[in-house]
Amino acid sequence: MAGVAVAVATTTPPDATATLQAMQSCRRESAALERLDCYDHLLAPLSPSGFDGALVKAGFVGEAWTRATEQEKRREGNTTELLVTQVPGERPTVVITTPAIGHVPPRPVLMFSCVDNITRMQVALMHPLDVHDIAVTLNADSRALRSHWFVRENGTLLESSRGLSGIDEIKQLFGAKTLTVDTGADNAAGKLTFNIDGLARAIAPLRDACHWAGE
């Protein structure tokens, strides 16, 4: 990637530092497809259509964002309890969602999922973030956990690490009644609070579907 970094620095000197930092973020992606997608979004040339191109980009809706928001459309009433859906099969899918407390619809959505045998903790945002990754503080009742999350799907999705580190992060939330995701951003996505009461019990089918170690 050194050759690419040089090309970027040569063609866009004012943004070279920010671009290189963003590329370092892409390199931290463990999954090859996610890493490729990160580079693709970072290095894609600007659309010559100007404002129209910006509108197209702003209108991009990602798969995980859609999964979270579509599940929340099935919620009855103004409730916040964890909503669980399961799709059986060789590679079962489990999705658990809850909307942000204190927000009017459309509300941000916290989602735990097992899709393609990968455990994910994500937040679907209604106001996009213009960064590639971000430091977050997870306040689970009185416990504060510091972490580093990725920003995906054109800024509309926050995602924790995957694999064992991501699973460990989820386990640290067990027993808490609420989770506040604090990104420090100066907008509506800055602090989001969710009802996670009963998470350890509700997540049982996800643990089975994604074959958590020791389950």
Where are the regions a protein language model picked out?
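A generic "folded-domain core" signal
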Residues: 11-24, 33-215
